[in-house]
Amino acid sequence: MSKFSFNIHHQHKKARSGIIATAHGEIRTPAFMPVGTRGTVKAMLPESVAETGADILLGNTYHLMLQPSAERIARLGGLHKFMNWDKPILTDSGGFQVMSLSKLRKITEEGVSFSSHINGDKYMLTPERSTAIQYLLGSTITMAFDECTPYPVTFEEAKTSMQLTTRWAHRSRNAFVKREGYAQFGIIQGSVYEELREQSAKGLVELDFDGYAIGGLAVGEGQELMFKVLDYAPDFLPQNKPRYLMGVGKPADIIGAVNRGIDMFDCVIPTRSGRNGQAFTKYGTVNICNSKYSGDNEPLEHDCPCPACTNYTKAYLHHLVRIGEILGSMLMTWHNLTYFQNLISRIREYIKLGKDFDFYS
């Protein structure tokens, strides 16, 4: 079994490419993680997700603790076996979903008490419980429990939230069961305030996490402000540890973030957009529902290797999506995930060659 490690093989300005070694295989970085929130990437077979080029996918503590429960998944052999995915899995701590989905939530020093958005049942999620759930799931990369600071927020509110996240990070770190090839990442907060981001990073770096995530971005602040934060926040983190920008996945955002030193990304954009009939291509986005595609006998992209492009026309995809056929969601999602993995692969190649990349400026 491989030890968890991160080796940077190439660097161009602030952009890095390398390999994360884990108990479940290697992750090429920069890496884009498809989101498999409930133990599945919507409208995709796990083996099909791997065929798009994904080295790792994301699962979610909040959703899996509610259905079918972490204990049941553990009894059935863990999340990898449960969903037939033998590559690395990173699990979100559940904090963001508790804040965004649950009603009647109450945040205390202990954790967050909340009602399930499914049936109203009462739950308590603490740093210790979140870490234990991720252990039961068998997550390759466990995320520390945090409070995702909303936007807009005052300096004092952001400071209070960041300090709570730091205290929770201590408890998450203490609760983590170390195993060879497995890792735990801390999450820095601080909203758009440089002083708070630096304080947060300093507190977490002292805990010697295996990697670090930048949370609390892509929550409404806009690209310009997000990039402003990314101009300084990665510099507060160790050079030899992976850096993960949570919830960010627009192509232009990925490119801008890699140029600022980010190594890992996740986002629902390619899958959600695919199910809604939007395709990403090198020529821009295509809304396949548009009537102008009803008689278009060309593929979405001529040089794309995905089944949607090699076997079907825009007219057929238009038909499937317009009538709500499941195959339409499957093909559009497959295409988008292939596009995103091809994009990230091109970025890795440009870094290796020492070339600037700005495909979406």
From Swiss-Prot:
Q: Which reaction does it catalyse?
A: 7-aminomethyl-7-carbaguanine + guanosine(34) in tRNA = 7-aminomethyl-7-carbaguanosine(34) in tRNA + guanine
Q: Which residues bind Zn(2+)?
A: 304, 306, 309, 335
Q: In which pathway does it act?
A: tRNA modification; tRNA-queuosine biosynthesis
GO annotation terms (biological process): queuosine biosynthetic process; tRNA wobble guanine modification; tRNA-guanine transglycosylation
* Xref: Pfam families: TGT
Instruction: Name the cofactor(s).
Output: Zn(2+)
A single GO molecular-function term is: metal ion binding
State the coiled-coil residue ranges.
none
Q: Positions of the region RNA binding? A: 247-253, 271-275
Keywords of the record, alphabetical order, are:
Glycosyltransferase, Metal-binding, Queuosine biosynthesis, Transferase, tRNA processing, Zinc
Question: What's in the GO CC field?
Answer: cytoplasm
How, per the record, is the cofactor bound? Binds 1 zinc ion per subunit.
Signal peptide coordinates: none
> Record's InterPro entries?
ArchSynthase1/Queuine_TRR, TGT, TGT-like_sf, tRNA_ribo_trans-like
Q: How does it assemble?
A: Homodimer. Within each dimer, one monomer is responsible for RNA recognition and catalysis, while the other monomer binds to the replacement base PreQ1.
* Stated family: Belongs to the queuine tRNA-ribosyltransferase family.
According to its UniProt entry, what is the function of this protein?
A: Catalyzes the base-exchange of a guanine (G) residue with the queuine precursor 7-aminomethyl-7-deazaguanine (PreQ1) at position 34 (anticodon wobble position) in tRNAs with GU(N) anticodons (tRNA-Asp, -Asn, -His and -Tyr). Catalysis occurs through a double-displacement mechanism. The nucleophile active site attacks the C1' of nucleotide 34 to detach the guanine base from the RNA, forming a covalent enzyme-RNA intermediate. The proton acceptor active site deprotonates the incoming PreQ1, allowing a nucleophilic attack on the C1' of the ribose to form the product.
- What is the protein name for this chain? Queuine tRNA-ribosyltransferase
User: Organism source for this protein?
Assistant: Rickettsia akari (strain Hartford)
Gene from which the chain derives: tgt
